[in-house]
């Protein structure tokens, strides 16, 4: 198991002994992790430096899992946070920008060539989840009156329509998970318990229930 530490490193946890057996230094304030091609990709946001002269980080660290050392840092758009790997040797990164003149941006990393490209099909996103060759994304920048939802086929590299097909309205989406053919969207106002919206493979809501404050993940 790999764990990101906000002090700038990633740890490897032995699941048998439950001991941390190794650590590797990466970028500032590492966020999410994705494994592809025997490498670990780490989004470094630098989020704790947002108000300083240093500012946000704008790198993704590449860690060789055989040696557990950082072998490369890739430049991406400012403030990368979310990261997902597909089965085609690509890693997708959502950079949050600076919440002003640099917008949220979805990028694709080729894990063999390390080429980074921005997705023109769906340039903006806040959160994403992945399952079975498909990215499920939403864009809900602060102050937006109507959040946007979309799918992206990672095999054909084509954008689809919203994964919500029954007109269900979610005003303040907070996180998204894709598990077992279903998509779960959490809604939160940062003050009260959040709700979980459960959508089937047909895009229709089949259940909604209350969770705790700021629900992050469904597994």
Give residue spans per PLM region.
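Predominantly soluble domains enriched in secretory-pathway, periplasmic, or organellar proteins
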Residues: 1-219
């Amino acid at each position: 198991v790999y764990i990101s530490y906000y002090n700038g490193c990633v740890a490897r946890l032995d699941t048998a002994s439950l001991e941390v057996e190794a650590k590797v230094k990466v970028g500032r304030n590492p966020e999410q992790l994705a494994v592809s091609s025997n490498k670990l990709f780490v989004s470094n946001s630098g989020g704790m430096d947002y108000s300083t002269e240093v500012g946000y980080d704008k790198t993704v660290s590449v860690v060789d899992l055989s040696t557990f050392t950082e072998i490369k840092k890739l430049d991406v758009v400012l403030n990368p946070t979310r990261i997902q790997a597909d089965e085609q040797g690509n890693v997708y990164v959502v950079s949050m920008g600076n919440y002003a003149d640099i917008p949220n941006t979805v990028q694709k990393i080729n894990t063999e060539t390390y080429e980074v490209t921005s997705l023109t099909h769906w340039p903006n996103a806040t959160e994403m989840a992945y399952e079975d060759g498909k990215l499920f994304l939403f864009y809900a920048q602060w102050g937006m009156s109507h959040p946007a939802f979309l799918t992206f086929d990672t095999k054909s590299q084509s954008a689809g329509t919203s994964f919500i097909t029954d007109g269900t309205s979610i005003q303040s989406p907070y996180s998204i998970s894709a598990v077992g053919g279903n998509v779960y969207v959490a809604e939160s106002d940062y003050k009260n318990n959040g709700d979980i919206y459960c959508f089937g493979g047909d895009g229709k809501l089949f259940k909604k229930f209350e969770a705790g404050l700021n629900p992050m993940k469904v597994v």
